[in-house]
Amino acid sequence: MEFKLEDFFPLYPESLSNNSKTRFEIGSLDVINTLKEFTDNRLDAIEILPTKPGEATKHQIVIRRLLSGYTQFDALLLVHEMGTGKTCSAIQAIEQNLIESNNGLFLRTVQTTEGIDDFNFNKNCNNNYGPGLDGAVILTRGKTLMNNFMDELVNRCSTNYSSGNRNEISKTSKKLFSKFYSFYTFEIFAKTVKKMRSSEIVKKFDNKIIVIDEAHNLRLSDVKVNDEKIDVYGEVHRFIHLLTNKKVLLLTGTPMKDGPQEIASLMNLILPLTQQMPTNKNFLKEYFPSTEAPQETYELGDEEEFLKSGGEEMKNIKKFKAQVYGCVSFLKAMDSKVLKVMVGERMGSLKHYKVVPEYMSTFQSKAYVSAYLQDKRERGIYNNSRQASRFVFPDGTYGAEGFKNYIIEKRGRGGKIFRLSPSLRKEIEKRSSFKSVHTLTDEQKEFLYLQNINEYSAEYAYIIKSILNATRNGELSIVYNDSVRGSGLIVLTLLLELFGFVRNNGTAKMKKSYGIFSNETTSVREIRALQKIFNSDENMNGNIMPVIFGSRVIAEGLTFKNVIHEHVVPHWNGSETEQVIARGWRLGSHEALIKKWEQNGQVGKKPQLNVYRHVVIPSSLLSSEVSRREDDLSLVTSSSRGIMENREIKSIDLIMYEVSEKKDIAISKVLRCLKEVAIDCQLFKKRNEKDSSFDYKRECEYEKCLYVCDDNGNNLTKKNIVNYETIYFREDVFLMFAMLENHYKTRFVSTLDEITEMFFNNKVLTHSVTKQEIIQLLYQVVSNNIPIKNVYGYPCYLYENYNVYYLVDHIIPFPSSEDIFLAYYSKHPQLYVKTDSQESGKASGTNYYQSVTWFNNVLNDYYESLIPLAIKDLTTLSNSTNLVSKTQMISKQLISLPNDVQQRIIEMAVAARVLEIYCNVQNTLPPLPAQLSKEWIERNQKSVFCKKKTFRTIILDHYKNYYRIDGVDSFKMAIVWFLSDIVEERAKERCLYGSSLNLKSGYTARPLWNEWKICGKKERVRVEKERSLIKKQYETDLGYYGLWNPKNNEFCIRDIRNQTGKKDKRSIPSGKRCVNWTKPALTELAAIAINIPIPNQSVLPTLKEAMEEIKSNKELRNIVPKDNNDNNLLIKLVFWYKLSRNDICINLREWFDRNNLLVEDNSCGVQTKRK
């Protein structure tokens, strides 16, 4: 084979010079779609997420390889939705660089489903410095996000820094990661680098990965830090562009919040200074020329022009894509299995958003109109109107003024304490037609309080009533409000306390409590504690904390589980609103509720998330035609009721949503460009592309969901493996080596075909292994004399002879073809050899075999010593009077014994069965055959297997598939093959021959169970036939049968439909773990092939529900028979598909067992399988 020099070096697209107009040549990155290290990790719509700390998802592997020290990708904007694991993506990239730099000298931990031990493969490699960077600088918006990042680093995304305590970050962990990771908040970092000279910055921070978490929070504006104005964005921008050797990773799920122009400031952080994008108004003129999108603090009147314009149309798309080419990764989250319902109706100019309207009382409307007109006169921001729409205090004030008059604020031991003033409390508790509030029932008091609250806030009355109803129904709620003081969250939570709720600071599990998440009221430690309480399974039905209230703190970095109701007080930015909603709606967020619902037989409504976007509308003050009942607190509203006839007075909430929707459409145009031009577009397309039911909705950027990647790889069909074999084979080699070592735990000699088959059938590696990779691994192990621990735990070395790989217990300087016989001594180690000089008084020339103490003999003696103890324990269990209980206890105890001990117990039980005609508990011996001595019979009668027939019967029944006896009365032979069924190795079948009963002189004291010998070739052939007969019992027309391994309680399914006539063992399918079958395959097996009866018909979906599910699910559509006319089959398919794989497997195992199609098999669930 001819090699070229480039075959030994990794090849990636080269970046262009900084004088070029683009970072990479357009089209050059299409090669990414052909590289094995990336294509092996192409995403599907659904991925089973790893459960062990440190294990990476497929997209995280892609990101860490893109940012490897071997590539020229030195900056990426990660536009990854909430719930995709952006933090772990960053940590994986950092750890990859640390390993490549060899600065960390990490031990690689190898974990597989077989429980393989750690092995530091690096110790056999050269520790030269590699291309990776040697540290990381992490910038976050605040301490909460910083702590979240640290927690992910220690407890989830890596195993290199954990101290074992998952509840907090220990000093030990901080000491470990502080060697490589530096953490700063935006403001502190900007203040730090502002004081440093350029040369100092380069010296301290060069050769590092820079990660900016929630990067969209870096704004083009000054920020006050200790009364000092600092241009945070400018300092970070200067810092990044000073460094010469760095990689930059910007993390964000929402790169734009206030308008599409914000993408420019983000991209300029990572684009060279000569390729900077225009910002603010200049960006809008270039790409959205029809309007200037308003900022969050725009003045009154601006919204009219914006709403009338066509500002959501984007121009010069090709130019924009060229500027960001090679710098963007785009990923959407996997869809949650829980339905998200937008409650309400469309109002005003809204085309997509649904809102829930509430109508102000005359009192609140009067104050709101005053606030609105004041905002209009002052040409300021809408702060007064927004405060008045939330809550108006009894004296007509709102916001800061009303808060000062009616809210009592004190500083307590645990922080600030707030409570309602007596005057405000009195107004809420004032009686109506009732004599005294103290004589009211709880229902009457609730109605009275809500009626009075509605006078001051229609929105808060609605929210509180919803919370009360949800709490009674065992449902969790979240309330988001960006205003904390004034008429904001503090007032709302204090009003809720009138209904028996108490504030929880995270220190105790108080019933009917609430948590408040804001920087003004709650510390970072309290926020973490409150989140843990709220997300606990104990709280899934609100038994402790049924509701939490949050400001902007909850919009980023936090996840909330089992939420049923989310209330959103209006905000200018659709992106921020969506961030809040995503906190309680992501894959797995409702897992506990769904599981409970399924366990209860799917009775009642399936859990779903209800989202309420609240809009408060002022009542008419100018027309006597508009009337409304002041005591109407119904949660059912109508958009035609109570609308202001004075067109100058508008609902600020509705305006905010109208502006938000229009901005969101413009932002989505940019997001669509980023998705299509992303460097990983083709790799992530199956995940990012939704089905047509989402056409023209926000999920598909308000366009058709079907899209085409700019780099689609259509012209590149050949998979390129050069980079993978040069670099990334090193990553998988650790895991592959562990699998190889595990393979040799059950053998000392193995062929290349057997090793290849083992890797091809693996369920551990994330990609399919090639034969070249296997040979490369074997070559490295053999040529570098890398030790492999054998079954005894001794280090051995692997050698090869004509594709046969064998273990020897020492290094062979010059291997030869005859060395293969040395494997015998690895399998049978010598512990001690006696020399002639030590044999004083004995003749020299002693037989070598007799002079050696063999390891196997010592091991067998040890197992023999265990047998009496094991039998004693088993016979104790057999004293139970209940036969079923006795059998179950003995079977459970047998499984826990070493395999060799189990083999000996079977042999003793079989021998006792052979002697049954001679066993007599009453010591009344039957007539003896002439050749048997009385002493021999008495010795055998002492066996517990003879004395206790029931015990022996249980033993033999338990192992019924592992022995055979040819005739008892005229005994010929018995065979036991328990060990050979576990380890596919010769000389494991053991035979008891009829000749053993023909005793010779001198053997009269030897029990029959000591007469077992290794079977000959003829008997081994007989064993193979017996195995085939056992399997044939289960090979019915169905084409499947179940396997159960009692040792590890694994359940496998064997598919024998295409087995007929196959002689080559490699082509015979072995049993596959049930949980490793795909969901569609299990569904088809349960619903079509087997058609398992469903006992509880009430849990089945309706035909309409089934049709809708199949229509929206491609996997289900693919398993529906083409000629199907059976509606019941469609219902069954959906029913089984909705269950977890584990639940389907439980049902399948029970069915196989009931129908006598479940066979015990010790190879189920292990890598080494007999066929």
UniProtKB/Swiss-Prot annotation:
Residues 67-273 form the Helicase ATP-binding domain. SUPFAM superfamilies: P-loop containing nucleoside triphosphate hydrolases. The keyword Ubl conjugation does not apply. Its EC number is 3.6.4.-. It is an enzyme of class 3 (hydrolase). ATP binds at H80, E81, M82, G83, T84, G85, K86, T87. A motif (DEAH box) lies at residues 213-216. The keyword Lipoprotein does not apply. InterPro entries: Helicase_ATP-bd, P-loop_NTPase, SNF2_N. It comes from the Viruses. One of its GO terms (molecular function) is ATP binding. Residues 510-588 form the Helicase C-terminal domain. Keywords: ATP-binding, Helicase, Hydrolase, Nucleotide-binding. Belongs to the IIV-6 022L family. SNF2/RAD54 helicase subfamily. This is Putative helicase 022L. It comes from Invertebrate iridescent virus 6 (IIV-6). The gene is NTP1.
